[in-house]
C-alpha cells in the first residue's frame, strides 16, 4: 500500500486491474478530510478518471474543499501517434512530494500546485517482455505470447498500446528508454534533473 507517514492518508482501491468506484473514492475523501481540505491524486486511466470526476462532483455537492492532481507521465510509444499518457510508477514519488508539502504546512492550493508541477515534470516508460496474467482467473493481458519481441510503452498492466521491437539486451533497452525519457523532459547531456 501507499498509506503511511510521509505518504497518503487514505487510498481507494478497486478490484485487481480495475479502478475503484466514484462512491468509494468519495468516501475515502470524506474520511481523509480533517478540515484543511483534501488533495485527490489520480492516475490518468479511464476508470480512475471516471471515478475521480464522480467523487469530485459528490465532494463539491457535500461542500468539501478538494483539489485534484492527475499524473500521466508515461511515454507511450504509440504507433498511431496518439498522445494518451497514462499514470505509472511516478505516482509513488508524487505521493511523497505532496505529503512532504502538506507536512511542511503548505495550504491545499500550494500542495496541489507543487504536486501538479512535479507530475508535469516527470516521465516514465514500461517495457514488457512477457504478458501479464490475472492472478484470479489466469487471463492474459496482451498477445506477445512466445515471440522474440518486447513492447515498449505497454502500460501499467501490460495492456498494450506501445511499439513492439525485437528483444534487446538490458543495456540496449536502457539506452532506448533513456533517450525517450530525456527527449520527453527536454534534457540534453550535462543537464541536471534536480
Q: What is the predicted function of each stretch?
A:
Residues 167-194:
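Gly/His-enriched, cation/cofactor- and phosphate-binding structural elements
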Residues 4-35, 182-184:
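Glycine-rich oxoanion-binding loops at beta->alpha junctions
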Residues 49-63:
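Short Gly/Thr/Asp-enriched flexible loops that form oxyanion-binding sites at enzyme active sites
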Residues 77-86, 95-162:
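Internal, active-site/partner-interface "lid" segment
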Residues 1-12, 76-77, 150-168:
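Gly-rich Lys/Arg/Thr-decorated short loops/hinges at beta-loop-alpha junctions or inter-strand turns
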Residues 1, 43-52, 86-91:
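Gly/Ser/Thr-rich loops at beta-strand to alpha-helix junctions
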Residues 11-16, 60-84:
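Short, acidic/small-residue loops that bind anionic groups at enzyme active sites
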Amino acid at each position: 500500500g501507499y498509506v503511511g507517514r510521509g505518504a497518503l492518508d487514505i487510498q481507494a482501491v478497486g478490484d485487481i486491474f480495475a479502478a475503484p468506484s466514484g462512491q468509494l473514492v468519495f468516501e475515502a475523501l470524506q474520511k481523509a478530510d480533517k478540515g484543511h481540505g483534501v488533495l485527490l491524486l489520480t492516475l490518468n486511466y479511464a476508470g480512475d478518471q471516471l471515478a475521480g470526476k464522480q467523487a469530485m462532483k459528490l465532494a463539491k455537492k457535500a461542500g468539501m474543499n478538494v483539489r485534484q492532481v492527475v499524473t500521466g507521465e508515461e511515454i507511450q510509444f504509440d504507433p498511431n501517434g496518439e498522445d494518451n499518457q497514462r499514470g505509472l510508477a511516478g505516482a509513488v514519488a508524487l505521493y511523497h512530494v505532496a505529503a512532504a508539502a502538506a507536512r511542511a504546512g503548505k495550504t491545499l492550493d500550494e500542495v496541489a500546485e507543487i504536486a501538479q508541477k512535479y507530475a508535469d515534470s516527470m516521465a516514465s516508460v514500461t517495457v514488457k517482455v512477457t504478458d501479464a496474467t490475472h492472478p484470479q482467473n489466469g487471463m492474459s493481458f496482451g498477445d506477445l505470447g512466445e515471440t522474440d519481441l518486447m513492447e515498449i510503452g505497454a502500460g501499467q498492466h501490460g495492456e498494450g498500446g506501445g511499439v513492439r521491437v525485437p528483444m534487446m539486451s538490458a543495456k540496449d533497452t536502457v539506452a532506448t528508454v533513456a533517450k525517450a525519457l530525456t527527449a520527453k523532459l527536454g534534457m540534453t547531456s550535462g543537464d541536471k534533473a534536480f
